[in-house]
């Protein structure tokens, strides 16, 4: 129906003028966090599958430059909402408030070499070794937990004038491991600096154009290296299709219309709903025209 065509529908069914949300009741503005360093992708996936149900939030920071037996080594970052009893005496006096963190601003005109393969490899190694092999627990405020990059204002300037590309894909459970190994290996062989790599598990899909499906999603941030990078990403698109996965439209910048239709099998059902509700295609976007969702891009 219209609801499920709109959820995940990229704003193409119209303007949402009213939303009712069901919220989770919490006692504090803090998160009880566990950091756990893993040796490789197999250990990362095993812990996510065995222990995800114990946490409200779960994500893995992946060292995208690691290769060989260390491929996919990660830092698991998992958290639950803290109760008042979890807080220090000082925090417990005002459990729904916290001290705002100090921020730094990246200056303009950062040289492109600041984020190359060598600097990214060095940073990843230092960040990975910052954590111990056994789990470490901590209490942090929700702002630091959910928005870790916000300490660095204008962080996108680190990529220089070339900018950056975000690529996120999802794979079903039966193909996830092999698919993740292929993606990480192919990008590493292509000498592409993977500046930020995040791995999560997904539940069931809902909307007709929803990105999630049961399985694993991998999100990657990379410097925009022009044609060489785009060629690799187009190859990855075909790999994603063969593994039964799809690419996240909200972050997409280079998917083809043909690949999109293969990745989203419920597109025809969504399109019929769109035609019924908006026969003149009044609601469209650069993305929808490029992917020929609402017409052909000029």
Q: Can you say where each PLM-predicted feature lies in the sequence?
A:
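Noncatalytic alpha-helical scaffold of FAD-dependent oxidoreductases
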Residues: 1-298
């Amino acid at each position: 129906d219209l609801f499920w065509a709109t959820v995940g529908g990229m704003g193409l069914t119209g303007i949402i003028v009213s939303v009712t949300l069901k919220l989770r009741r919490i006692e504090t503005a803090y998160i009880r966090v566990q950091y756990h360093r893993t040796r490789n992708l197999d250990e990362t996936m095993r812990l996510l599958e065995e222990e995800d149900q114990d946490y409200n939030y779960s994500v893995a920071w992946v060292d995208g430059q690691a290769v060989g037996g260390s491929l996919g080594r990660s830092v698991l970052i998992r958290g639950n909402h803290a109760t008042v009893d979890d807080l220090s005496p000082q925090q417990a006096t005002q459990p729904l408030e916290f001290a705002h963190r100090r921020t730094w601003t990246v200056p303009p005109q950062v040289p492109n070499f600041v984020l190359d393969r060598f600097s990214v490899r060095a940073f990843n190694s230092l960040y990975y070794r910052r954590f111990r092999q056994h789990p470490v627990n901590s209490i942090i405020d929700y702002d630091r937990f959910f928005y870790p990059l916000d300490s660095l204002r204008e962080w996108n300037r680190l990529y220089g004038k070339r900018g950056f590309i975000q690529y996120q894909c999802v794979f079903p459970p039966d193909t996830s491991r092999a698919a993740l190994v292929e993606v990480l290996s192919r990008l590493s062989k292509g000498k592409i600096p993977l500046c930020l790599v995040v791995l999560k598990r997904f539940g069931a899909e809902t909307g007709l154009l929803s990105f999630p499906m049961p399985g694993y999603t991998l999100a990657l941030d990379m410097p925009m290296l022009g044609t060489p990078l785009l060629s690799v990403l187009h190859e990855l698109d075909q790999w994603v299709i063969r593994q039964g996965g799809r690419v996240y439209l909200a972050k997409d910048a280079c998917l083809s219309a043909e690949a999109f239709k293969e990745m989203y099998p419920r597109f025809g059902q969504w399109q019929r709903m769109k035609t019924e509700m908006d026969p003149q295609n009044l609601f469209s976007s650069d993305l929808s025209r490029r992917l020929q969702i609402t017409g052909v891009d000029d």
